[in-house]
C-alpha cells in the first residue's frame, strides 16, 4: 500500500521544492512553467513522460503553446506521496531552464 504523507512529512518535503504550490481543495501540488516556444515545452513534456512511465506514476498536466501546468497527487493514496515528491524533483531538474509560468 502506498503511504500518504502526513502533514509534517508534506511540510518537510515541500521545503526542498520552492517552485511547487498546494492545490486548493486537494492534497496535491502544482507547478506552472513557461518555455521559449512550443518545441521546448513539448521536449520537456516528453522527458517527463518517459520518467513518469518508468515510475508508473503519471502527472496531470495541461499544455498551451509554451506553457505547461503540472499537478501531482497519488490517486491510489488519495493525496501526496513520496512518488509525487520524486517526480517533482525530476521535473525541477528537467525544467531548470524554464521560467515560472504566468
From Swiss-Prot:
Per UniProt, the keywords (alphabetical) are: Lyase
Q: What is the reaction catalyzed? A: (4aS,6R)-4a-hydroxy-L-erythro-5,6,7,8-tetrahydrobiopterin = (6R)-L-erythro-6,7-dihydrobiopterin + H2O
GO terms, molecular function = 4-alpha-hydroxytetrahydrobiopterin dehydratase activity
Entry's Gene Ontology BP terms: tetrahydrobiopterin biosynthetic process
Q: What is its EC number?
A: 4.2.1.96
Top EC category:
lyase
Q: Which domain of life is it from?
A: Bacteria
The family database entries (CDD domains) matched by this protein are listed as: PCD_DCoH_subfamily_b
Q: Which InterPro entries match?
A: PCD_sf, Pterin_deHydtase
Could you tell me which Pfam families the record lists for this protein? Pterin_4a (PF01329)
Signal peptide (from-to): none
Residues that span the membrane, as ranges: none
Family affiliation: Belongs to the pterin-4-alpha-carbinolamine dehydratase family.
Name under which the protein is recorded: Putative pterin-4-alpha-carbinolamine dehydratase
Q: Species name for this entry?
A: Burkholderia orbicola (strain MC0-3)
